[in-house]
Curated annotation (Swiss-Prot):
Keywords: Glycoprotein, Membrane, Transmembrane, Transmembrane helix. Pfam families: SRTM1. Glycans are attached at N11. It is found in: Membrane. This is Serine-rich and transmembrane domain-containing 2. InterPro entries: SERTM. It is a single-pass membrane protein. One of its GO terms (cellular component) is membrane. The chain crosses the membrane at residues 38-58.
Length: 89
């Protein structure tokens, strides 16, 4: 019984499948549509990675040398220098 089902219903190798007009018509835009998609995907991922890299580098730069307001009239002191200048009663 199952052999009869496979012979007539399950096996599609005996049937001829002719290509439709959509698969036969191969224009230039169809040839390169996948290429354009992959190039666009690659460029967008590259742009995202570059943006992340630059933001991480800027954060690291601010951690290493924090931004201070550049006022030349006000001297900058470290904590050790400030503790030695505090008057003691």
């Amino acid at each position: 019984m199952t052999e009869v089902l496979f012979k007539y219903h399950g096996n599609l190798t005996g049937r001829a499948h002719f290509p439709t007009l959509a698969t036969e018509a191969d224009t230039t835009s169809d040839k390169y549509s996948n290429l354009y998609m992959y190039v666009g995907l690659f460029l967008s991922l590259l742009a995202i990675l570059l943006i992340l890299l630059f933001t991480m580098l800027l954060r690291l730069k601010h951690v290493i040398s924090p931004i201070t307001e550049s006022t030349e009239s006000v001297p900058q002191f470290t904590d050790v220098e400030m503790q030695s200048r505090i008057p003691t009663p």
